[in-house]
UniProtKB/Swiss-Prot annotation:
Pfam families: TraC (PF07820). Disulfide bonds: none annotated. This is Conjugal transfer protein TraC. It comes from the Bacteria. InterPro entries: Conjugal_Transfer_TraC, TraC. Keywords: Conjugation, Plasmid. NCBIfam families: CjTranTraC_Agrob, PRK13848.1. Residues 60-98 are annotated as: Disordered.
Length: 98
């Protein structure tokens, strides 16, 4: 038996809420770590910081290559990447900057 569209919409809304909560937790975690490491005190452009986080992510994933801080065509921001989570957490938190 197929689900009615209203039930599917409810399930999608519930899953979107769960995703948002998970992204918020990830952003807060990475933001706390970044602040403990002193990144809140460094005056750096967001694109440079993004590139640095992408390099760190590649290092931990075992990948190679340099990061540019720019997304390639077709790439999307899913919230599962540390750099994406930090960017959203930094915008929301803001308490670590002087």
């Amino acid at each position: 038996m197929k689900k009615p569209s209203s039930k599917i919409r409810e399930e999608i809304a519930r899953l979107q809420d769960q995703l948002k909560q998970a992204e918020t937790r990830e952003a807060e975690r990475i933001g706390r770590i970044a602040l403990k490491a002193g990144l809140g005190e460094i005056d750096i452009e967001e694109s440079q910081l993004q590139a640095a986080f992408e390099e760190v992510a590649k290092r931990f994933r075992g990948g190679k290559g340099s990061a540019t801080g720019k997304r390639q065509a077709g790439e999307s921001r899913t919230g599962t990447e540390p750099s994406a989570a930090l960017a959203s957490g930094a915008d929301e938190g803001g308490s670590g900057e002087a």
